Regions:
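Catalytic machinery of carbohydrate-active enzymes
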Residues: 82-471
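Short, hydrophobic alpha-helical segments
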Residues: 36-43, 66-78, 286, 290, ...
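Short hydrophobic beta-strand element within catalytic cores of glycosyltransferases
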Residues: 3, 7-10, 396-398
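A charged, aromatic-enriched C-terminal amphipathic alpha-helix characteristic of glycosyltransferases
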Residues: 43-80, 452-457
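Conserved acidic donor-binding segment of nucleotide-sugar-dependent glycosyltransferases
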Residues: 21-29, 37-42, 416-417, 456
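Short acidic/histidine- and often glycine-rich active-site loop of Leloir-type glycosyltransferases
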Residues: 9-23, 390, 406-410
Length: 471
C-alpha cells in the first residue's frame, strides 16, 4: 500500500523506517486513534509515502509481494476499482504457502547514453527504464498486441510498469519522448531464450492433455523450455529437449513465463476453460492454434500380466457427476464381457470392486499402464486414467455425458452419450464447477433428475457401442 502511495495504519515490528505509516498495537482504540491521526493530516501522510518508495529497495518489495500474492497487477498507483482490491484481498486471504518467486531475467538495451531499459515477459510483460539524467522528463510507454494498442501510459525515468495479461501475446513495447520520437522499440522474440511453463494443476488428466503443447511451443519458437508438472516422470524420457523441474523450484535466467491451469480469469487465459476442449486450455495460454495432439508417455511395457484376453476398466473418479450412476450399469457390462470370454481388471485405485471383475491391489502408475497396455481395450469415465490409457495408445471407451464430446479426445475413442436428457453442463458457460460439492449438479441437484446424464445411459447402450471391439 505504501508503495502505491496509500498511508497505512498497522502493526510493524521491523527496523525499516516506513514513512507514511502510523504504527499501532493490536488494540481497537489505538487503531482508531491512528486512523484519526492520518485523516487529520492526510496530504502530509500521502507525501511521506514517497520517502518509503525512495528508501525501500524495490526488489525487496516485489519479492515479498510475489510470495504473498499469486497475481500482481500494476502497483504503481492505488486501487482503481473494488474488483482489483478484492482480487488482492482474496489471494491474501487464501493463506496458502507459495513457493519462492521465479528469478526474472532482464534484458538491458541502451538506446541513448542517458537511458537504460530492462524488459522481460515473465508472468506478463514488464518494462523499466532508468536514467542518470533528467528524472522529471515524461515519456510515453505503449504495449501492443501485434499491431493493436493494449495499454499506454506516461512514465518518468527510474520507474517500471507491467501488465496484468499473463497468457502468450506477441508483445511489442515502445517508449517515446515528448516530441513523439521513439527511444525504445522492441518486439518480443523467444528464439534462443529461456521460457518457463508451469502447470498449475496436479491432475493426471490435465498433465497428460497439456504436455504435447509444451513441446509444440518449444519447436514453434525455437526456445529453451523449462517445464514444471506434478507428473514429470511420465514425460521426461519422451521429451528430452524440455528441461523438467519440480513445482516450486527456483528457475533462473528467464525471458518469459506462462502458467497453465483453470483460472477463470481473463487476465490469465483468453477463454473460460470450462467452455472449451481441455487441450485448448493450454493452446490458448501458449498462443498455439488448437488441434488434438497425442501425448507421449514414458512407458516401457513388461511381460503380459494375465494369460488370456481381458479388458481394463476404471469406475472411480473425483466428482459425483463423473460417475456412471446407472444402478446396474457396471455389473451388467462386466457380466456381458465375461460371457464373451473376457476377464475384467478394475484398475481404479479407490472404491468398491465390481462383481465379476478383479481389482488391482498394486496400483502404481507403472503397473496400471502395463495392465492397460496388454488389455484389449479400456473402459472408463472422463478421468485421468482414460487420458493415461489414451496416452499409451489404447482404445478408450469413455462413458461421459456431462461434458461435450470434444472436451476430452476424439481419436481412438468410442464415446458413450445420451443427448436425449440433460447433458453437457460442464461446458455450459452459465455454470462454474464447485470442487467442494461432491453432488454438484447445477440444474437438478436435490431432485429425482440429479445426475440423469449418466443414470440414463443403460448397459445396453454401452454394449451396443463396444460390439465392434469384441473379438
Amino acid at each position: 500500500a505504501l508503495s502505491s502511495g496509500l498511508p497505512v495504519v498497522g502493526t510493524y515490528d521491523g527496523s525499516q523506517e516506513l514513512h507514511g505509516m502510523v504504527r499501532v498495537n493490536r488494540n481497537t482504540n489505538e487503531v482508531i486513534e491512528g486512523i484519526k491521526t492520518i485523516l487529520l493530516d492526510y496530504p502530509k501522510y500521502v507525501e511521506l509515502t514517497k520517502k518509503t518508495r525512495q528508501n525501500y529497495d524495490w526488489s525487496v518489495i516485489v519479492n515479498r509481494m510475489y510470495k504473498m500474492y499469486k497475481t500482481i497487477g500494476i502497483i504503481s498507483k492505488p486501487y482503481t476499482s473494488e474488483d482489483t482490491k478484492n482480487l488482492y484481498m482474496n489471494e491474501y486471504g487464501r493463506n496458502e504457502e507459495y513457493s519462492e518467486p521465479t528469478q526474472e531475467v532482464v534484458t538491458p538495451t541502451v538506446v541513448e547514453d542517458s537511458l537504460r531499459f530492462n524488459y522481460h515477459f515473465v508472468d506478463g510483460p514488464y518494462f523499466e527504464f532508468l536514467s542518470d539524467g533528467d528524472t522529471d522528463k515524461e515519456y510515453t510507454v505503449t504495449f501492443y498486441d501485434g499491431e493493436k494498442e493494449i495499454y499506454s501510459s506516461k512514465m518518468k525515468p527510474n520507474t517500471w510498469t507491467r501488465l496484468n495479461r499473463k497468457y502468450y501475446t506477441p508483445w511489442r513495447i515502445t517508449l517515446s519522448n515528448d516530441n513523439g520520437d521513439l527511444v525504445f522499440d522492441q518486439t518480443m522474440s523467444l528464439k534462443g531464450k529461456r521460457v518457463y511453463i508451469a502447470f498449475d494443476s496436479s491432475s493426471l488428466g490435465d498433465s497428460i492433455a497439456w504436455i504435447p503443447y509444451v513441446e509444440n511451443f518449444r519447436v514453434r519458437h525455437e526456445c529453451e523450455v523449462i517445464c514444471s508438472t506434478f507428473k514429470n516422470d511420465l514425460f521426461m524420457s519422451e521429451y528430452p529437449y524440455i528441461e523438467f523441474t519440480q513445482p516450486g523450484s527456483v528457475v533462473k535466467d528467464l525471458h518469459a513465463m506462462y502458467k497453465v491451469g483453470w483460472f477463470n480469469n481473463s487476465f490469465l487465459e483468453p477463454e473460460s476453460p470450462n467452455t472449451i476442449p481441455l487441450q485448448k486450455t493450454i493452446s490458448n495460454i501458449l498462443g498455439i492454434p488448437f488441434e488434438e495432439l497425442q501425448p507421449r508417455i514414458s512407458f516401457r511395457p513388461t511381460e503380459r500380466p494375465i494369460v488370456g484376453k481381458y479388458v481394463t476398466v476404471a469406475n472411480e473418479s473425483t466428482a459425483g457427476l463423473k460417475y456412471w450412476n446407472h444402478p446396474t450399469g457396471w455389473v451388467e457390462l462386466v457380466k456381458y464381457l465375461n460371457e464373451q470370454g473376457y476377464q475384467v481388471i478394475n484398475v481404479s485405485k479407490n472404491g468398491d470392486n465390481i462383481p465379476g471383475s478383479t481389482k488391482l491391489t498394486e496400483t502404481s502408475l507403472e503397473t496400471t499402464m502395463n495392465y492397460i497396455h496388454h488389455s484389449e481395450f479400456f473402459i472408463g469415465l472422463s478421468s485421468g486414467l482414460s487420458w493415461l490409457a489414451w496416452g499409451i495408445g489404447k482404445h478408450v471407451v469413455m462413458i461421459s455425458n456431462f461434458t461435450e464430446p470434444d472436451h476430452e479426445f476424439t481419436n481412438n475413442c468410442t464415446r458413450i452419450v445420451n443427448h436425449s436428457v440433460c447433458n453437457g453442463c460442464w461446458n455450459n458457460p452459465m455454470f462454474k464447477f464447485d470442487k467442494g460439492d461432491w453432488n454438484w449438479c447445477p440444474e437438478h441437484k436435490g431432485t429425482p433428475r440429479q445426475f440423469e446424464c449418466h443414470k440414463s445411459i443403460t448397459p445396453e447402450m454401452v454394449i451396443n457401442q463396444i460390439k465392434h471391439l469384441i473379438k
